[in-house]
């Protein structure tokens, strides 16, 4: 299932109906697996203990009415028709909403923000709109957010809470989905046998599921959609059969009047049972979170014309069967499989297990994606990210997270041993994410859509009231399983916030202790300091977008030598999902031209994939060569903190892999196997006996460069032949004396523990390990 090929991010003017329908079909397997399997456990969880099924049928009809209107109002109205429109350049999810708010309110959790970042083509959605059209409440809200750091932190914490609950759902969804699917075995064996078989079978399936993650889903992705489609056809067909066979008048229960009768009769018990009913919308958030792989129209079509009617028919069919079967042999027989005709139970069981695995797979890969986004935005320690597909950028695998999820999932399964407690936990996680989305959407309506605050108030009041009602019913089950997502979210939130706090403090230290450019120019201009310049290119990795990092002076102090070409490289994330390759690099000079000092800023979106080290090196060198050739600052921002008064002018330079009309680089071992076109101008040097590699820059046919630029390119060629060395800081952060106890605990213990147990500073920066030198420094923050 090649989602990348049909992705709306590709430069297609308008998707054809065939493309839209194909995407809608594929979305069944990626987006709706979790939502489609909810009929397996909704009725069973609802009637677990709070309410009982009586001969009046008021309970079963009231529950059916609640399910119908919940499915209609939350997934259909809220998500399909409203929330899906709040995409971040085609991307969805909690971080997409947070990113939109950060850009429109000009706030950011990323410390190294630049005004030049606002020139990115994806930075402003609907950039043609006049910002003066923002209404008075919008201006007031925008100014309030910009002025108060506390509110910015609260907005970040709110987004992180939603993210942590999604991670918690990644633990609970596989457990409850597989548990409910396997529960069909209870009808073919005694209760004594069943209690010894069910848990081991569930654990075996879960272990197999998590063990296969490193292979990636692209190899089996093509069967996901057929499995979910077969499941939807199965439950809808069984539903239609049960409706006509047992109770054709069950449709009357769709009236809201039955909700009133249900709550009037059951009162507090009915309210407490809402925690089971809300499971009918579990997986709805995936419609928005997975928007980046599809289009709004394809997801809307798939839900409106396939998923929604199938689920309604399935729930109506179960209610029709139960309305004629009031005396059940055992408590656990209120469930999905009891309404399945006995002749087809085994095939349905097989399809249900496959559908549960597909639904679990979707939430697991979604958890991987969220962790990657958090890492990109500096809110999670660096972890190993493996790209399992060269064609589909979203297919990733994170070993540490995978095994952690598996252990937690097995612990939940073995610890609870039934769906009642797991459903209580899953319900709280699901409704919390939806509440966070509702809160963020109300801000998006005012700040991004520039609507009246009345629309935002109406949105948060209507949907917030429904969700708060479900949230309260889930929270009351805190001691009966609902504590699990709270505990998991608290742990992950603590990890994220401590890491983010430590990262900010480390950056503040870098800013306060950066070296004066005058010192650097004096160092380069003096011949009496014993500083030796060696062949090659020295790349100084730093998070600073201006100034000279302290690690460079620390390096020079201990090793008085530097390369003939020095590049201060900053690889940073920006609050957009993707940065176009032609806008990736910002290149400028540091000091006079003859010193061969450059600054290069590589910008990535929170969903971008970092290139491998060889391609990144070539793009970096070609961007500098293109800057030398053009030497005309296009988009630049002066550095207000420059202590020498020399402005660093930064030019947007396209990566060589995407700019065929720019400077191209050719490298070989001197055997002339690959010769550039004779119509292009070639900058090269005579083969040197010291270096085996030969480097040539091929300029565009129309390129005209002066003598000094040609000399500079020649020197860059010589330096590239000599090789590149990457120098980066390895920080040891400590709280300064006099800090509060909480700060000392957070920095000296929390952040230090996370730093020591996460990937090193060079990981994920597209730098070759063999050419990397780490400079240790102690940061007193």
Swiss-Prot record:
<keyword id="KW-0406">Ion transport</keyword>
<feature type="topological domain" description="Cytoplasmic">
    <location>
        <begin position="499"/>
        <end position="781"/>
    </location>
</feature>
<keyword id="KW-0325">Glycoprotein</keyword>
<dbReference type="InterPro" id="IPR053951">
    <property type="entry name" value="K_trans_N"/>
</dbReference>
<feature type="topological domain" description="Extracellular">
    <location>
        <begin position="177"/>
        <end position="195"/>
    </location>
</feature>
<feature type="topological domain" description="Cytoplasmic">
    <location>
        <begin position="1"/>
        <end position="16"/>
    </location>
</feature>
<feature type="transmembrane region" description="Helical">
    <location>
        <begin position="396"/>
        <end position="416"/>
    </location>
</feature>
<feature type="transmembrane region" description="Helical">
    <location>
        <begin position="478"/>
        <end position="498"/>
    </location>
</feature>
<feature type="transmembrane region" description="Helical">
    <location>
        <begin position="274"/>
        <end position="294"/>
    </location>
</feature>
<feature type="topological domain" description="Cytoplasmic">
    <location>
        <begin position="84"/>
        <end position="155"/>
    </location>
</feature>
<dbReference type="Pfam" id="PF02705">
    <property type="entry name" value="K_trans"/>
</dbReference>
<feature type="transmembrane region" description="Helical">
    <location>
        <begin position="156"/>
        <end position="176"/>
    </location>
</feature>
<keyword id="KW-0472">Membrane</keyword>
<dbReference type="InterPro" id="IPR053952">
    <property type="entry name" value="K_trans_C"/>
</dbReference>
<comment type="function">
    <text>Probable potassium transporter.</text>
</comment>
<keyword id="KW-0813">Transport</keyword>
<feature type="topological domain" description="Extracellular">
    <location>
        <begin position="241"/>
        <end position="273"/>
    </location>
</feature>
<dbReference type="Pfam" id="PF22776">
    <property type="entry name" value="K_trans_C"/>
</dbReference>
<keyword id="KW-1133">Transmembrane helix</keyword>
<feature type="transmembrane region" description="Helical">
    <location>
        <begin position="17"/>
        <end position="37"/>
    </location>
</feature>
<feature type="transmembrane region" description="Helical">
    <location>
        <begin position="220"/>
        <end position="240"/>
    </location>
</feature>
<feature type="transmembrane region" description="Helical">
    <location>
        <begin position="196"/>
        <end position="216"/>
    </location>
</feature>
<dbReference type="GO" id="GO:0005886">
    <property type="term" value="C:plasma membrane"/>
</dbReference>
<feature type="transmembrane region" description="Helical">
    <location>
        <begin position="348"/>
        <end position="368"/>
    </location>
</feature>
<feature type="topological domain" description="Cytoplasmic">
    <location>
        <begin position="369"/>
        <end position="395"/>
    </location>
</feature>
<comment type="similarity">
    <text>Belongs to the HAK/KUP transporter (TC 2.A.72.3) family.</text>
</comment>
<feature type="glycosylation site" description="N-linked (GlcNAc...) asparagine">
    <location>
        <position position="424"/>
    </location>
</feature>
<feature type="topological domain" description="Extracellular">
    <location>
        <position position="477"/>
    </location>
</feature>
<keyword id="KW-1003">Cell membrane</keyword>
<keyword id="KW-0630">Potassium</keyword>
<feature type="topological domain" description="Cytoplasmic">
    <location>
        <begin position="448"/>
        <end position="455"/>
    </location>
</feature>
<feature type="transmembrane region" description="Helical">
    <location>
        <begin position="456"/>
        <end position="476"/>
    </location>
</feature>
<dbReference type="GO" id="GO:0015079">
    <property type="term" value="F:potassium ion transmembrane transporter activity"/>
</dbReference>
<feature type="transmembrane region" description="Helical">
    <location>
        <begin position="297"/>
        <end position="317"/>
    </location>
</feature>
<feature type="transmembrane region" description="Helical">
    <location>
        <begin position="427"/>
        <end position="447"/>
    </location>
</feature>
<keyword id="KW-0633">Potassium transport</keyword>
<feature type="topological domain" description="Cytoplasmic">
    <location>
        <begin position="217"/>
        <end position="219"/>
    </location>
</feature>
<dbReference type="InterPro" id="IPR003855">
    <property type="entry name" value="K+_transporter"/>
</dbReference>
<feature type="topological domain" description="Cytoplasmic">
    <location>
        <begin position="295"/>
        <end position="296"/>
    </location>
</feature>
<feature type="topological domain" description="Extracellular">
    <location>
        <begin position="417"/>
        <end position="426"/>
    </location>
</feature>
<feature type="transmembrane region" description="Helical">
    <location>
        <begin position="63"/>
        <end position="83"/>
    </location>
</feature>
<feature type="topological domain" description="Extracellular">
    <location>
        <begin position="318"/>
        <end position="347"/>
    </location>
</feature>
């Amino acid at each position: 299932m090649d989602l990348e090929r049909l992705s709306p991010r590709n430069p297609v003017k308008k998707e054809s109906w065939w493309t839209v329908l194909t995407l809608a079909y594929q979305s069944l397997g990626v987006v709706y697996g979790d939502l489609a399997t909810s009929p397996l456990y909704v009725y069973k969880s609802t009637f677990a203990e709070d309410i009982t099924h009586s001969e009046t049928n008021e309970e079963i009809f009231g529950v059916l009415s609640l399910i119908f209107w919940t499915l209609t109002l939350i997934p259909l109205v809220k998500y399909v028709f409203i929330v899906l429109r709040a995409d971040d350049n085609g991307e969805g999810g909690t971080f997409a909403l947070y990113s939109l708010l950060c850009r429109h309110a000009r706030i950011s959790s990323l410390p190294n923000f630049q005004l030049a970042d606002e020139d990115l083509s994806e930075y402003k959605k609907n950039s043609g709109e006049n910002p003066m059209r923002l209404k008075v409440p919008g201006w007031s809200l925008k100014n309030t957010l910009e002025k108060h750091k506390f509110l910015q932190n609260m907005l970040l914490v709110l987004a992180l809470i939603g993210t942590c609950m999604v991670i918690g759902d990644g633990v609970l969804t596989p457990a409850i989905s597989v548990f409910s699917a396997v529960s069909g075995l209870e009808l073919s064996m005694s209760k004594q046998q069943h209690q010894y078989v069910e848990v081991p079978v569930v654990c075996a399936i879960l272990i197999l599921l998590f063990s296969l993650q490193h292979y990636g889903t692209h190899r089996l992705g093509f069967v996901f959609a057929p499995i979910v489609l077969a499941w939807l056809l199965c439950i809808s067909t069984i539903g239609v059969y049960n409706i006509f066979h047992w109770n054709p008048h069950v449709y009357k229960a769709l009236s809201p009047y039955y909700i009133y009768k249900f709550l009037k009769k059951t009162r507090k018990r009915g309210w407490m049972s809402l925690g089971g009913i809300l499971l009918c919308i579990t997986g709805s958030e995936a419609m928005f979170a997975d928007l980046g792989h599809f289009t709004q129209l394809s997801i809307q079509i798939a839900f409106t014309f396939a998923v929604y009617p199938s689920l309604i028919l399935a729930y109506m069919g179960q209610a029709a069967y139960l309305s004629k079967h009031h005396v059940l042999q055992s408590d656990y027989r209120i469930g999905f499989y009891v309404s399945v005709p006995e002749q087809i139970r085994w095939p349905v069981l097989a399809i249900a297990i496959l559908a549960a695995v597909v639904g679990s797979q979707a939430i697991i890969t979604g958890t991987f994606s969220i962790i990657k986004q958090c890492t990109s935005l500096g809110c999670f320690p660096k972890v190993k990210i493996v790209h399992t597909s060269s064609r589909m950028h979203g297919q990733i695998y994170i070993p540490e997270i995978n095994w952690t999820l598996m252990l937690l999932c097995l612990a939940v399964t073995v610890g609870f041993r039934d769906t009642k407690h797991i459903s209580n936990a899953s319900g709280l996680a699901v409704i919390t994410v939806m509440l966070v989305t509702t809160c963020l959407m109300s801000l998006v309506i005012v700040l991004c859509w520039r609507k009246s605050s009345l629309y935002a108030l109406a949105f948060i009041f209507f949907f917030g009231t429904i969700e708060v009602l479900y949230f309260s019913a889930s929270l009351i089950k805190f001691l009966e399983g609902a504590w699990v997502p709270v505990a998991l979210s608290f742990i992950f939130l603590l990890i994220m916030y401590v890491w983010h706090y430590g990262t900010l403090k480390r950056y503040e230290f870098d800013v306060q202790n950066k070296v004066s450019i005058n010192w650097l120019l004096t160092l380069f201009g003096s011949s009496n300091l014993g500083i030796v310049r060696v062949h090659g290119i020295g790349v100084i990795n730093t998070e600073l977008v201006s100034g000279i990092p302290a690690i460079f002076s620390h390096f020079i102090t201990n090793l008085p030598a530097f390369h003939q070409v020095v590049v201060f490289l900053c690889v940073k994330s920006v609050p957009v999902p993707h940065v176009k390759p032609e806008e990736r690099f910002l290149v400028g000079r540091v000091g006079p031209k003859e010193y061969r000092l450059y600054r290069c800023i590589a910008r990535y979106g929170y969903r971008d994939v970092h290139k491998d080290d060889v391609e990144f090196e070539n793009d970096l060198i070609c961007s500098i060569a293109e800057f030398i050739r053009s030497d005309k600052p296009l988009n630049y921002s002066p550095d207000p903190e420059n202590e020498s008064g020399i402005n660093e002018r930064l030019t947007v330079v396209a990566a060589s892999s995407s700019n065929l009309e720019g400077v191209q680089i050719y490298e070989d071992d001197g055997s002339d196997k690959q010769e550039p076109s004779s119509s292009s101008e070639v900058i090269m040097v005579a083969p040197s006996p010291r270096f085996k590699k030969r480097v040539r820059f091929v300029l565009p046919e129309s390129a005209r460069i002066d003598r000094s630029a040609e000399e500079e390119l020649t020197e860059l060629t010589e330096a590239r032949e000599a090789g590149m060395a990457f120098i980066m800081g390895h920080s040891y952060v400590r709280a300064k004396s006099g800090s509060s106890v909480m700060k000392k605990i957070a920095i000296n213990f929390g952040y230090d523990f996370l730093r020591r147990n996460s990937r090193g500073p060079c990981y994920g920066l597209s730098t070759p390990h063999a050419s990397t030198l780490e400079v240790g420094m102690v940061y007193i923050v």
